[in-house]
Amino acid sequence: MERPQPDSMPQDLSEALKEATKEVHTQAENAEFMRNFQKGQVTRDGFKLVMASLYHIYVALEEEIERNKESPVFAPVYFPEELHRKAALEQDLAFWYGPRWQEVIPYTPAMQRYVKRLHEVGRTEPELLVAHAYTRYLGDLSGGQVLKKIAQKALDLPSSGEGLAFFTFPNIASATKFKQLYRSRMNSLEMTPAVRQRVIEEAKTAFLLNIQLFEELQELLTHDTKDQSPSRAPGLRQRASNKVQDSAPVETPRGKPPLNTRSQAPLLRWVLTLSFLVATVAVGLYAM
């Protein structure tokens, strides 16, 4: 398939991003695991892995956002009070993993690749950072709200919202109006046609990184379920700091070592739980 040329893309950057990622969205939307997820087929242990993954992603993303908050290539879409998720995820991880959560949450190779790419962009190509921010934050603000309700019911979580702070945006009164504001600010970013095309390609990379992460966690759960905790499985390690990881590049991982997990739940339920990573982005971007 030929890649659309910059002058054939929609004029607004937000519409161009939506159009360019339509194909990968369709693949996620039509997948059986996504349809079944919406039926509430979720496990607690799988959900814990998802939340750990999101934590690593947002620590890196928000570190780079802070680095570039005064840069003209990002400043117009800098909304820390409204959007930043690190603090909320810290609350959730304490709920799911206990007070020593930082010592036990997993940090897989795919998570490391995602983190590495975010740091690369923030430090060397900050004009591309908006692609990751838009893909993640607006996805969480939109589709994440749907998935929050599903997870709350399926996992029998407290009505107070404990364990789901990630999905709550207390400083946004109207998600619809805020998304309109964000898109307007993003569309106002000044960039050459060449940079614009690179931003569009980076949005595709953001989807790819999410899908790779999903595939890795899915593989983790396909192996035998012996006496091993997900956070201590072979090939996993805990993240000691926010430093850039010298791990593998963004290409699809191959030859990964077998990873084990303790859950006795049917494989299908695990896979559906981990589809959350793809579903949040896919549902979110196209519910806007």
Swiss-Prot record:
Binding site for heme b: K18, H25, Y134, R183
Highest taxon, organism lineage: Eukaryota
Keyword Acyltransferase in annotation: no
Enzyme class: oxidoreductase
Positions of modified residues (Phosphoserine): S229
Cell location: Endoplasmic reticulum membrane
Topology within the bilayer: Single-pass type IV membrane protein
Annotated site (Important for catalytic activity): D140
Keywords recorded for this protein, A-Z: Apoptosis, Endoplasmic reticulum, Heme, Host-virus interaction, Iron, Membrane, Metal-binding, Oxidoreductase, Phosphoprotein, Transmembrane, Transmembrane helix
Stored SUPFAM superfamilies: Heme oxygenase-like
Annotated domain remarks: The transmembrane domain is necessary for its oligomerization.
Name of the protein described by the UniProt record: Heme oxygenase 1
